[in-house]
C-alpha cells in the first residue's frame, strides 16, 4: 500500500481576545481530558507574552519503558495511524487496534559509543515519523503542534539506572497532537483559533469548521466561574521529616567527600488534598507569575505549575539551542505582615551573590550545561549569554544563567533532549552517578517532577520548562515535590529549609483555592 502524503490543511478564524487564558480554558475545556494550557511571561516584569490552549487533541501519545501507545481521539487523528503503519522500521513491533497502536521499540544497546546510542532507534522516532506522515505547509507554524510532558524517569530508557517502584500513573512521556489550538498574543492582543486537518474527508473538514464557529461563539458568551470547592481542613503530609531528609543529605555529602560526585539534588514530597486544581492554578499564577505556567488535564492525572526554569529551548530559524540553569536560592525579604521589605530583600540578594557555596554550586552547573551542549552543538558555537543574574518570585529568589549554542546540522531536537536530560539543576554532577544516588535514597520514581513540559512543532521549534514549583494531582491528591542542591559546603538544615521554601508557593495556592487552614 502506497503511503500518500497529504499537506496539513489549516482552518483558521479570529476570536475575541481575552486577557485571562485560565478563564478561557475553563470556558472551552472545563473537565475535558487531553487538554493543555501553556502560558509564558517576561521574567523581570512578569507581563504575559503568549498563551496556547490545546482545546481538542487528535492523538494522545504516551510511553512507559520501551512501549509507546498512540490513541486516536478523533477520526481526523485516526487517519494518521494508517500512515504511520507504513513508515515504521522492522525493528519496531506494531500491535494494531481499531483506534490505537502499541509500538514496542528495541531496548537501547548500552555497549555502543555515545554518538551511536544517540542515533539509535528509540521511542523519540514516534514523533519523527508522525511528522513525516504529512506534508507541511510553507510559512505556517504550529500546523503539527505537540504539547505535553517528558517525565524525569524517561532517562531510564537511555541510561542504565536502578529500576524503581512506580506509585503514580504518570507515564514516561505524554503528548497531545493538537487538532484545535487557540493562540493568544498578549502583546498584539489578538486571538487565533486554528484546526489542523490531517485527511481529505469532507465530513471531517465540515466538523472542524463547525467546531471553530462554536468556539468563536462561546468566547462571546458569559464566562463561567472557575470551580471553587471548599475543604474545611487540609492535612499537609511529607514523605520525609526534616530529620530524615537531613540524614539523607549527610549521607550524600559523604559521597561528595569520597569524590563519587560533586553535587546532587535530593528531593522530598509534600501531599495535600486538591479537588479544585484549576482554581489552585489560577491562584498560583496570580501569586507567583513565572516565565512558564502550565495546566495539563490528562485522562489519568492533572499537572499544573509555575516554573522559573527553562529546560531546553530551540529556534529552528536561528538553529540556536538554550539551557537556563538555576542554582542558588534564598527566601524573599518580607515584613511580618508578608509584604516585600525592599531593603531586606536587597541585603538577602547581596548575601546570596557573595556566598561562596552558592557561587561554586551555580558555576558547577553552568559548566555542566556547557558540557551538555558540547555533545550536540557545532564546535565553537557555545557561549554564556548571561551569568549569575537574579530572578525574583513570590516566595524565593534565584541565581540564574543562560548558555547558548548552535545545534549540529545532523541532529534534531529529540537528539538534543536525549543528550541533555535530565537537567543538572535537578540531578547534580556527574549526572549518571548523581541520578544513581538519587534512586538509591528516594527509592521511587520521580514521575513528572524534574522532567519537562512544553511543546514542539513540525518545524522543529521546541520550548520546554523544568517541572518544578508544580503539583501532580491524581485521585484528588496533590504531590508537591521539591529538592535542594547539595555540595561539600552545604549546611543540612539550611537545605531542608530550602526544599520547604521552594514548595511553599504551590502549597499555599492549593490551601487558598480551597479556603482552608493548614494542619501540619
Curated annotation (Swiss-Prot):
- So where does chorismate get bound? 328-329, 449, 469, 483-485
Among the GO biological process terms of this entry, one is: L-tryptophan biosynthetic process
Q: Which SUPFAM superfamilies does UniProt cross-reference here?
A: ADC synthase
User: So which domain of life are we looking at?
Assistant: Bacteria
Record-linked NCBIfam families:
PRK13564.1 (NF010079), trpE_proteo (TIGR00565)
What is the species of this protein?
Buchnera aphidicola subsp. Pemphigus spyrothecae
Question: What biological function has been recorded for the protein in this entry?
Answer: Part of a heterotetrameric complex that catalyzes the two-step biosynthesis of anthranilate, an intermediate in the biosynthesis of L-tryptophan. In the first step, the glutamine-binding beta subunit (TrpG) of anthranilate synthase (AS) provides the glutamine amidotransferase activity which generates ammonia as a substrate that, along with chorismate, is used in the second step, catalyzed by the large alpha subunit of AS (TrpE) to produce anthranilate. In the absence of TrpG, TrpE can synthesize anthranilate directly from chorismate and high concentrations of ammonia.
Under which name does UniProt file this protein? Anthranilate synthase component 1
Citing just one GO molecular function, the answer is: anthranilate synthase activity
Q: Which family does it belong to?
A: Belongs to the anthranilate synthase component I family.
Q: How is this protein's activity controlled?
A: Feedback inhibited by tryptophan.
Amino acid at each position: 500500500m502506497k503511503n500518500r502524503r497529504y499537506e496539513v490543511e489549516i482552518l483558521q478564524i479570529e476570536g475575541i481576545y481575552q486577557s485571562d487564558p485560565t478563564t478561557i480554558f475553563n470556558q472551552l475545556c472545563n473537565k475535558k481530558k487531553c487538554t493543555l494550557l501553556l502560558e509564558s511571561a517576561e521574567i523581570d516584569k512578569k507581563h504575559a507574552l503568549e498563551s496556547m490552549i490545546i482545546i481538542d487533541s487528535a492523538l494522545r501519545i504516551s510511553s512507559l519503558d520501551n512501549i509507546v501507545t498512540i490513541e486516536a481521539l478523533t477520526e481526523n487523528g485516526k487517519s494518521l495511524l494508517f500512515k504511520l503503519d507504513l513508515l515504521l522500521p522492522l525493528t519496531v513491533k506494531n500491535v494494531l487496534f481499531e483506534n490505537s497502536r502499541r509500538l514496542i521499540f528495541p531496548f537501547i544497546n548500552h555497549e555502543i559509543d555515545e554518538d551511536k546510542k544517540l542515533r539509535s532507534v528509540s521511542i523519540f522516532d514516534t514523533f519523527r515519523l508522525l511528522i513525516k506522515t504529512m506534508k507541511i505547509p510553507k510559512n505556517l507554524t504550529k500546523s503539527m503542534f505537540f504539547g505535553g510532558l517528558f517525565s524525569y524517569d524517561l532517562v531510564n530508557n537511555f541510561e542504565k539506572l536502578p529500576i524503581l517502584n512506580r506509585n503514580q500513573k504518570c507515564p514516561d512521556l505524554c503528548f497531545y497532537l493538537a487538532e484545535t489550538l487557540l493562540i493568544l498574543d498578549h502583546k498584539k492582543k489578538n486571538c487565533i483559533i486554528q484546526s489542523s486537518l490531517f485527511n481529505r474527508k469532507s465530513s471531517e473538514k465540515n466538523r472542524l469548521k463547525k467546531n471553530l464557529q462554536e468556539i468563536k461563539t462561546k468566547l462571546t458568551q458569559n464566562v463561567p466561574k472557575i470551580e471553587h470547592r471548599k475543604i474545611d481542613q487540609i492535612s499537609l503530609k511529607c514523605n520525609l521529616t526534616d530529620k530524615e531528609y537531613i540524614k539523607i543529605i549527610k549521607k550524600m555529602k559523604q559521597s561528595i567527600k569520597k569524590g563519587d560526585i560533586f553535587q546532587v539534588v535530593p528531593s522530598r514530597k509534600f501531599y495535600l488534598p486538591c479537588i479544585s486544581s484549576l482554581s489552585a492554578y489560577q491562584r498560583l499564577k496570580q501569586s507567583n507569575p513565572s516565565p512558564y505556567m502550565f495546566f495539563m488535564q490528562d485522562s489519568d492525572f492533572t499537572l499544573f505549575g509555575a516554573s522559573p526554569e527553562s529546560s531546553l529551548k530551540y529556534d529552528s530559524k536561528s538553529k540556536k539551542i538554550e539551557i537556563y540553569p538555576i542554582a542558588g536560592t534564598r527566601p524573599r525579604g518580607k515584613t511580618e505582615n508578608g509584604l516585600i521589605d525592599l531593603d531586606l530583600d536587597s541585603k538577602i540578594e547581596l548575601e546570596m551573590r557573595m556566598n561562596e557555596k552558592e557561587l561554586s554550586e551555580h558555576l558547577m552547573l553552568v559548566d555542566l550545561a556547557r558540557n551538555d551542549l558540547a555533545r550536540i552543538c557545532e564546535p565553537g558555537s557555545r557561549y554564556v549569554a548571561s551569568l549569575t543574574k537574579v530572578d525574583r518570585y513570590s516566595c524565593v529568589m534565584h541565581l540564574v544563567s543562560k548558555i547558548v549554542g548552535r545545534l549540529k546540522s545532523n541532529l534534531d531536537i529529540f537528539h538534543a533532549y536525549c543528550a541533555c536530560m535530565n537537567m543538572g539543576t535537578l540531578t547534580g554532577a556527574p549526572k549518571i552517578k548523581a541520578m544513581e544516588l538519587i534512586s538509591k535514597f528516594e527509592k521511587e520514581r520521580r514521575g513528572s517532577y524534574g522532567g519537562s513540559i512544553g511543546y514542539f512543532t513540525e518545524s522543529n521549534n521546541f520550548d520546554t520548562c523544568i517541572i518544578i514549583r508544580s503539583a501532580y494531582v491524581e485521585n484528588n491528591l496533590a504531590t508537591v515535590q521539591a529538592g535542594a542542591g547539595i555540595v561539600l559546603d552545604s549546611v543540612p538544615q539550611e537545605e531542608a529549609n530550602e526544599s520547604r521554601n521552594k514548595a511553599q508557593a504551590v502549597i499555599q495556592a492549593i490551601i487558598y483555592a480551597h479556603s482552608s487552614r493548614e494542619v501540619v
